[in-house]
Amino acid sequence: YKRQELTEKADEQAIAIFGENLRNLLLQSPLKGKVVLGFDPAYRTGCKLAVVDETGKVLAIQVIYPHKPATAAKREAAGPAFKKIIEDYQVDMVAIGNGTASRESELFVAEQLKAVKRDVFYVIVNEAGASVYSASEVARKEFPDLQVEERSAVSIARRLQDPLAELVKIDPKAVGVGQYQHDVSQKRLAEQLDFVVETAVNQVGVDVNTALSLIHISEPTRLGMISY
């Protein structure tokens, strides 16, 4: 009995920590009024770039190959291509995903930005769950014409702009902020994380001009919002 009691207490503590970490992630300050370039790093398949405007609308998608094993010609072309997209769309911030090839990509971006004549900053963004989102039904509906990796770059850019609006599209268990998540009660964990997401959204509120269309909003309500 004592062992079961200790296990239950440990489970509750792990679930509570997961919930608190998720809340902190969801309630990060948004970055308003900036054009952001999402940079999804990779080696062999190239780095995916996505430019989104101040409202999160996708303006441009591109792939560059700044890292080996790409050919010398491709690596040489990556810098000018990156600077061109920065200038063409007057990008304010670069959001670099923290996955594979992140460190090399950070060095590449920092070096290229030295040649840009205005202030453009970069930041490393936690991309946990971006691949889950980009392969999801929600992402396919939102971006039917984009490849999975291109959707990831968009998600990385938007996470910097509005973490809450982007992260609510992903199963909370996929954002990688918990411990022992597969060892605890999945039902209790799901209930706690759903509660955290709901309270975070209620605390911040929803901008219907930019919020994702959700299935639990009825068609008449949606049409009413649009006509209003």
Language-model-derived ranges and their functions:
Residues 1, 215, 219-228:
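Single conserved hydrophobic/aromatic residue that forms the stacking wall/gate
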Residues 2-32:
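Extended, charged alpha/beta regions that create polyanion-binding interfaces
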Residues 17, 21, 77-84:
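Well-ordered alpha-helical segments embedded in enzymatic catalytic cores
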Residues 30-57:
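Gly/Thr-rich phosphate-binding beta-strand-loop-beta motif of the actin/hexokinase/Hsp70
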Residues 40, 94, 160, 216:
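Residue-level signature of catalytic and energy-coupling elements of molecular machines
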Residues 52-73:
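Short glycine-rich, Thr/Ser-proximal phosphate-binding strand/loop in the N-terminal lobe
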Residues 73-82, 89, 93, 100-201:
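Conserved phosphate-handling catalytic cores of large alpha/beta enzymes
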Residues 195-214:
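C-terminal extensions
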